[in-house]
């Protein structure tokens, strides 16, 4: 990384402290990935059982019930995906957008691919009976949706993986998306994800198809015990394979992000997963003797949830460690750039036209901190300098303005047309001292005065 140019970070304050954003990122990602797993796993199992149903009709009815869940889990996966996407944009703006830029057209293809996948999912669900005599067509529709659900996470995973390794960006830029896909740890991580999706869905279907309110009589060839055995097995087998896939992921991870704390989280997850495997095996053995869901099922669900949280936390710890030096250098580059800008403003080259606003006290503060979102006369993200000056041109306007800058609680209401779509980030005394804020207020009052 020492030989690569480091882009300057964006000199804007975060809306929350970085550790708080990291916790939010992990929490929201866990919620998102649970429903992504159920969406992908449900799609794969629905198609699998529909194919098996060609010879045994009972499997077709089972596949239909599974397919009904996918449109629900799909919607929840999309809604819950917004939060972690925003959080990672805030925490890792430069790495994330750099990776997006490198993967380019393939990255943006996620949007049309998701759209087509969702349309195929609805088509597969709502043509079940209409295409009952054309199973080849119907299965093809479901298989195409499943294939897209497999491709989309692959693209996303490859992109998020790339952002962690700035030293590989030039290689990826020259080699294209194929170079990104075939980085050593992408395919093992993808296998780990797909196995988790099938295991999670198997456990979900144990509850969905054998709970007290489930209409088991819709499956004449099945009983609660047989369904429970089948889907505990669906959950157990990929979980066992994870004990091979997990170490493969760890072995192929570049050491740049490894830390003792991250490995401790992984170790705890492995131990707990082994306990879950034991419990699922006992549930399979005792299924014939337990007509209802046992208490052990909920122990399994809770333990699996803790495993997911531990794995997601380990993932974030690895990312933070891998990008620690890059982030620090990027912030330093931003500081150096602001120093150069300030020097240029204070010492303009000979013959350079002078900005007439330079002589107004407070203009330099406005230019450095506000101009990205507030135009002088035009609304950008927030209201213009003229509008703000008119609003705070009262005897107590300076104090009210300081309150707004410090707390984002605006004591003066803008007109609807000038109302910003989001709250402005607060500026503490460490960012703008009292004199700078009051000087900024004076500048706004000055530019708001009617000109002769």
Show where each model-derived region lies.
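Gly/Gly-Pro-rich "capping" loops immediately C-terminal to redox-active cysteine motifs
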Residues: 375-407
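Sequence/structural segment immediately N-terminal to covalent heme-attachment motifs in c-type
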Residues: 356-378, 403
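Internal/C-terminal transmembrane anchor helices
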Residues: 290-319
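Membrane-interface helix-loop-helix modules in multi-pass inner-membrane proteins
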Residues: 73-141, 244-274
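Hydrophobic cores of alpha-helical transmembrane segments in multi-pass inner/ER membrane proteins
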Residues: 36-46, 108-125, 191-208, 268-283
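Axial heme c-ligation environment in periplasmic c-type cytochrome domains
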Residues: 381-389, 408-439
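Membrane-interface interhelical loops and short amphipathic "cap" helices
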Residues: 2-29, 56-62, 86-106, 159-190, ...
């Amino acid at each position: 990384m020492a030989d690569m140019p480091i882009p300057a970070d964006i000199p804007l304050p975060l809306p929350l402290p970085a550790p708080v954003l990291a916790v939010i990122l992990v929490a929201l990602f866990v919620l998102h990935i649970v429903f992504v797993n159920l969406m992908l796993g449900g799609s794969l199992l629905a198609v699998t059982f529909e194919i098996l149903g060609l010879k045994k009709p009972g499997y077709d009815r089972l596949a239909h019930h599974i397919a009904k869940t996918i449109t629900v889990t799909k919607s929840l996966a999309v809604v819950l995906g917004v939060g972690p996407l925003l959080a990672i944009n805030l925490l890792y703006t430069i790495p994330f957008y750099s990776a997006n830029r490198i993967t380019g057209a393939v990255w943006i293809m996620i949007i049309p691919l998701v759209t087509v996948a969702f349309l195929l999912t609805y088509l597969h669900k709502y043509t079940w009976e209409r295409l009952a005599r054309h199973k080849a067509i119907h299965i093809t529709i479901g298989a195409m949706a499943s294939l897209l659900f497999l491709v989309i996470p692959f693209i996303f995973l490859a992109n998020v993986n790339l952002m962690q390794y700035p030293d590989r960006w030039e290689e990826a830029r020259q080699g294209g998306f194929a170079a990104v896909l075939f980085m050593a740890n992408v395919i093992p991580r993808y296998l780990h994800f797909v196995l988790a999706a099938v295991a999670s869905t198997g456990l979900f279907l144990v509850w969905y198809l054998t709970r007290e309110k489930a209409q088991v009589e819709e499956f004449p060839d099945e009983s609660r015990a047989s369904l429970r055995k089948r889907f505990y097995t669906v959950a157990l087998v990929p979980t066992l394979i994870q004990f091979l896939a997990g170490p493969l992921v760890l072995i192929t991870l570049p050491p740049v992000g490894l830390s003792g704390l991250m490995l401790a989280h992984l170790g705890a997850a492995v131990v707990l997963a082994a306990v879950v495997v034991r419990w699922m095996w006992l549930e399979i053995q005792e299924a014939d003797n337990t007509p209802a869901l046992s208490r052990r099922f909920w122990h399994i669900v809770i333990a699996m949830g803790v495993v997911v949280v531990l794995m997601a936390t380990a993932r974030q710890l690895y990312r933070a460690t891998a990008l620690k030096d890059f982030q620090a250098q990027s912030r330093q580059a931003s500081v150096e750039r602001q120093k150069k800008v300030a020097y240029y403003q204070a010492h303009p080259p000979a013959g350079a036209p002078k900005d007439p606003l330079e002589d107004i006290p407070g203009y330099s503060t406005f230019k450095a901190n506000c101009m990205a979102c507030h135009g002088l006369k035009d609304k950008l993200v927030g209201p213009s300098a003229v509008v703000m000056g008119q609003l705070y041109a009262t005897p107590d306007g300076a104090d009210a303005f300081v309150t707004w800058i410090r707390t984002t609680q605006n004591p003066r209401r803008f007109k609807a047309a000038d109302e910003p779509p989001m709250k402005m980030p607060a500026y503490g005394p460490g960012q703008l001292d009292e004199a700078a804020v009051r000087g900024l207020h004076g500048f706004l009052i000055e530019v708001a005065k009617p000109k002769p």
